[in-house]
């Protein structure tokens, strides 16, 4: 049927139902939800949890936890991770409730802010522009390399003493391990980050948390701005 829309008409679009991957197993565990609407979900991920299954950690991932949340609440959406975090990074993760919403978000700038605990006393603020590439001898490790992809991070120091700094970091690009690689590059690896030279006697997971997300909603066209506290990192800073 061909019909020309008229002022005042209401148009309803029903997205097709998606079927989750058969490899995903629902992981029933309480989910820390900080924002939800018909299209998006923002949750707070703990440390020691993958966003998605991997060979080393095939189950109990965040996406499987969200899948269980769908089942428990009779929701038929299929979650898609939009902003992924490393296994040991904590904080905010944005998920889309449909592949089409995920696609729309891929064309929207998402501002992300992190809090990092690093070795040594950092400068009051800084800009790190250094290309990042995969290390030749590893499929996991990244490094600053002239052959890498452009990467830019900016930071400001919130608190600092001789052996440790608490920094607010803003990503301007989204390379794998970007903050971890950039802070190693400037001589201030993240505390607890053994992969990038930040070993610590008491802390064995890197101290990094995504504390803020801001973007324009792909459907509602309003600004979504979510911020969480970082009390744990402040406690660690005071302890060190």
Task: Give the residues covered by each predicted segment.
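RNA pseudouridine synthases
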Residues: 1-240
